[in-house]
Amino acid sequence: MNLRGYSYRLVKANKAADSKHIGVKLGRYCITNDIPVIQIAQQFSVSRMTVYNWFSGIVMPHKATVAQIEKLLSK
């Protein structure tokens, strides 16, 4: 796994978070596929901090965003 662009701390937090959380699933997908946080933030019109919080399982995305994330993850 290439960690370029992701800190060890974020990767560790993502691995420790509940894998049932859609934001955590998104984080694992992005880390594995080396997709930058800024790209996800722009795609979903949120801040980078929001994306980091999703990846860590701290907050859940809004319902409308969850549907968009599920669509992205199903590709």
Report residues per predicted region.
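A short, Lys/Arg-rich alpha-helix, primarily the initiator
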Residues: 7-33
